Amino acid sequence: MSLAIVHTRAALGVNAPPITIEVHISNGLPGLTMVGLPETTVKEARDRVRSAIINSGYEFPAKKITINLAPADLPKEGGRYDLPIAVALLAASEQLTASNLEAYELVGELALTGALRGVPGAISSATEAIRAGRNIIVATENAAEVGLISKEGCFIADHLQTVCAFLEGKHALERPLAQDMASPTATADLRDVIGQEQGKRGLEITAAGGHNLLLIGPPGTGKTMLASRLSGILPPLSNEEALESAAILSLVNADTVQKRWQQRPFRSPHHSASLTAMVGGGAIPAPGEISLAHNGILFLDELPEFERRTLDALREPIESGQIHLSRTRAKITYPARFQLIAAMNPSPTGHYQGNHNRCTPEQTLRYLNRLSGPFLDRFDLSLEIPLPPPGILSQHASKGESSATVKKRVIAAHERQYRRQKKLNARLEGREIQKYCVLHHDDARWLEDTLVHLGLSIRAWQRLLKVARTIADIELADQISRQHLQEAVSYRAIDRLLIHLQKLLA
C-alpha cells in the first residue's frame, strides 16, 4: 500500500497526547515533505530516518513522500518520532507487511545505524498508551522507566530491524523487568544536630502537617543542617505519588528516575537561580525546580539573596499546587505541590543584636524588606535558630531522639489526618478549617487579640489554626486547646523580629 498510519505520543509537560504519523508515497519527483507543525529537531528526522533505513538493510523509497504529523495544532519536537516515521515509511513502501500496526504505539529516536535511543517522558507516553488500550514499543534505554509502571503492554527494542521483525511476527520482543524499589539511601539523622530542641520540634510539626517552614538565625547555628534532615522524618512516597514525581523527573533526567523511586524529592537551587529555572519555561515549557520538587521539599537557603520577583512567582503555586506556563506555541500545566523550607540570616551581617551586630535597625529592616509581605505570609511556621548557649558543646548531654523515632510520630499524625479529612492539615481550605479546627469561645477570642497585637492577616490566622491542629494531632488530641494555640503562635519569629525592629525605629 502507498499509505500507512502509525500511532505515537508527543511530550507536552507530563501529558502525552496521541499523535498519528501518516505517510503517503506517490509518483513524482523524489523528495520528502513533512507537515504538521514539526520543529527543527523533527525536520532533521528525514536525514536520520533515511540513514537508519538504509543501514538496517532496507531501501529508502525514491519517490515523492509526504509525512503528516496529526493533529497539526500540537507543537512537536525532539527525536521521539524517528521510529514511527521509519516504520510508517517501510509499511507504505510495502517493505514491511504488518497487519496489526493499529494495536501498537512507537516512541524512540533512531541512530544512523538503526539503533534505538531513549527519549524523555517515556513514563507519560507508556501510561497514556496503556490507558488507551494499546501496546507501546520503546527503546531499551527507557526500560527502567517504563518498568516502574507495568510490564504488561510495554515492549523494549534496541534496533529498527528488531521492531520490524516483531511487527511481522518473526521475532519476539522483551518486556521491561518490573523494577524493585531502590533501597533507601542513608539520610542524615536528627541526632547529629546539637541542641536546637525547638528547631527539632518545629521540624516535626512541619513534617506532620505538610507545612511551610522559615528558619531564621545567625550563621552556623544549624539551619541548613535541620532542613536537610526533614526528608529523613517524612514517610516514603506512595506508588501514585512516586509515579507522578518520576514522570516529571523523566522529562529532564531519566537516568536518576529509578535511583530515586519512592524517595521524596529534595531540591535546593542556588540563590542565583533565575525565574525560568525556578518555575519552568522555554518555547515549549520545561519543568522548573518547583515542579521537580513535586511531592517533596524545595529548600531555599540564603532566602533574601534570591531575586524578589523569583520568590513572588512562588506565591500562586504554593497555594494551588500547580504552575501554569503560557507561551505562544504551548500552554502547559505542571504539578507543583511541595513543602517550602527556607533559611535566612536576620541581617546582612548575620546578627541583629548582641556583640556581633554591625548593622543599624534601618539596615536590618531594609535587608528584610527584600522579602514581600505576601510571600512571608505563605510560611506556616517561622523559627529562630539562635546561637547555642555556652557549655553545650563541651557537655556530654543526650543527643535527643533519632529521625526514626520522630518519623513514627509523623506517620501516625499523617494517618490520623487522612482518616479524618482525607488530606494533610496544610491543605485544608476555608470551610474545612471551620469544620476541623474548632476552638472554644475563649480560645478564639485570645487568638484574635494575639493576631491584632502581631498585625497578622486572615491568611496567617488560618495558617495558625492549621499548625495548632497539627500539634493536637501529634499529641493525639481531638480538640485544639489553648496550649496548642500558644505553641503555634510561638512559631512566628519573623513577625516578632519585625515588631522589634519597628520599636527600635520608633
Curated annotation (Swiss-Prot):
Signal peptide: none annotated. GO terms for molecular function: ATP binding; ATP hydrolysis activity. It comes from the Bacteria. Pfam families: ChlI, Mg_chelatase, Mg_chelatase_C. SUPFAM superfamilies: P-loop containing nucleoside triphosphate hydrolases, Ribosomal protein S5 domain 2-like. Disulfide bonds: none annotated. Gene3D superfamilies: 3.30.230.10, P-loop containing nucleotide triphosphate hydrolases. InterPro entries: AAA+_ATPase, CHLI-like, Mg_chelat-rel, Mg_chelat-rel_C, Mg_chelatse_chII-like_cat_dom, P-loop_NTPase, Ribosomal_Su5_D2-typ_SF, Ribsml_uS5_D2-typ_fold_subgr. Belongs to the Mg-chelatase subunits D/I family. ComM subfamily. PANTHER family: COMPETENCE PROTEIN COMM, MAGNESIUM-CHELATASE SUBUNIT CHLI. This is Uncharacterized protein YifB. It comes from Salmonella typhimurium (strain LT2 / SGSC1412 / ATCC 700720). The gene is yifB.
